[in-house]
Amino acid sequence: MAETDGSIPLIPVRMLNEHVYCPRLAYLMWVQGEFSHNEFTVDGVIRHRRVDAGGGVLPSETQEDSRIHARSVSLSSERLGITAKIDLVEGEGAYVSPVDYKRGKRPHVAGGAYEPERVQLCAQGLLLREHGFASDGGALYFVASRERVPVAFDDELIGRTLAAIDEMGRTALSGTMPPPLEDSPKCPRCSLVGICLPDEVRFLSHLSVEPRPIIPADGRGLPLYVQSPKAYVRKDGDCLVIEEERVRVAEARLGETSQVALFGNATLTTAALHECLRREIPVTWLSYGGWFMGHTVSTGHRNVETRTYQYQRSFDPETCLNLARRWIVAKIANCRTLLRRNWRGEGDEAKAPPGLLMSLQDDMRHAMRAPSLEVLLGIEGASAGRYFQHFSRMLRGGDGEGMGFDFTTRNRRPPKDPVNALLSFAYAMLTREWTVALAAVGLDPYRGFYHQPRFGRPALALDMMEPFRPLIADSTVLMAINNGEIRTGDFVRSAGGCNLTDSARKRFIAGFERRMEQEVTHPIFKYTISYRRLLEVQARLLTRYLSGEIPAYPNFVTR
């Protein structure tokens, strides 16, 4: 590669390894700032602790009889355009060899090791040469098998290494992510498979057969909800401790916490907030009644490229209308399915009226043909009116009165009856979930396509949650009422509004979390996935659509 012109930073040598292994993986990690641990990467971090603790320095002047044994040596070269932290440099005088540690066992292949590892080691040797040392070879040390494999820096390997540097630099400058590997055995073991979505992207681009079920299990912990106004949350080692009036009432391990949600006047100490930011655990702030007020994250996702695509496409009226149509069609379809599945009645009224289902089907057709966002908004409103007019028929007792619940129409700000109070709270929680999911993949939750940007309103979160309102929020309300978890005595009425009591809110949150953890079969990809993981997958698919990698955004519609 020619000498860098300042348009891209120096390429980390470890990224050359990823590029030779999979160009898309290197692009995701280096250009877009994506990363996710799995058992293999965590094990690698543990096994690297000794060499990473070095901070070694090479002698500025070499002597013939001087021995060199330095760990964790950092070197860079503007001419080569690369930088590296070498695990170990050993040698004597001007003749040195880099040693790179690998977590696994030695592979019995030609050359003693796979090409990505040999290229990475050779790049380290080239850096040593740039700094005045002679380096004709190095070694790979495989920790699991405790074997050392020598690697000679011959002309062929040097040529391949220089070509890899040039290829990666050009790829980074292109601004186009390389396509996913095709049906590769590398994908299932990759820690970024749930971010890359190789099979899903190829399937949606009509390039391959149905995706393999390679979505990793949820391993990011669970949300921590703190709703007591007297709660005081502090850090104690690797835990968040919740106290009330200096009495320890609960604790949560930071490593098992995916996000923190604070209601009302609950207090989070500065030290605890700093630790959440360091670990990239988002903190959301809600009013006492559950209204979403704000979101605290660390420095934010480094994927500027994704947000650039988002902002560019959000100013395109055709893109906005196309996405909005599909969101509303999916929402109406899921509302229709919820009515059909949960309708309660006897005799001739045991099933949802065909006329109602047909009207909702017509609403879907009209929404797909809406000529403008304003017309689409009217169609959505009319369809929502039909849906909520019959919402009580899904409540136990037919009209909801058997459980003491009466619902006739949707109202809010403030909700005036128990069912509306539950719906508003569920929608606020779903908004928070989508805000967290969108920020986690590099999108701006506040720049929408259907919902217009307004101060403090997470417009894109509101866009994306439309198809999930009936599937997650409304379903949680139905289950809470029909299963007897929430009763009419669990509400406080004041100032013309209706709100949940503290104990009832805690039970409802538990029900919402159960729904988020429930697994469902994806109608397009055919694998099972939890609703929580599904939100992230859908958010990542939106980024793939906005970048032009897939032709259309695939909404989630149940049958």
From Swiss-Prot:
Binds 1 [4Fe-4S] cluster per subunit. Residues 224-559 are annotated as: CRISPR-associated endonuclease Cas1. It catalyses: exonucleolytic cleavage in the 5'- to 3'-direction to yield nucleoside 3'-phosphates. It is an enzyme of class 3 (hydrolase). One of its GO terms (molecular function) is exonuclease activity. Keywords: 4Fe-4S, Antiviral defense, DNA-binding, Endonuclease, Exonuclease, Hydrolase, Iron, Iron-sulfur, Magnesium, Manganese, Metal-binding, Nuclease. PANTHER family: CRISPR-ASSOCIATED ENDONUCLEASE CAS1 1 (PTHR34353:SF2). CRISPR (clustered regularly interspaced short palindromic repeat), is an adaptive immune system that provides protection against mobile genetic elements (viruses, transposable elements and conjugative plasmids). CRISPR clusters contain spacers, sequences complementary to antecedent mobile elements, and target invading nucleic acids. CRISPR clusters are transcribed and processed into CRISPR RNA (crRNA). The Cas4 region acts as a ssDNA exonuclease, while the Cas1 region acts as a dsDNA endonuclease. Involved in the integration of spacer DNA into the CRISPR cassette. This is CRISPR-associated exonuclease Cas4/endonuclease Cas1 fusion. The lineage of its organism: Bacteria, Pseudomonadati, Thermodesulfobacteriota, Desulfuromonadia, Geobacterales. The gene is cas4-cas1.
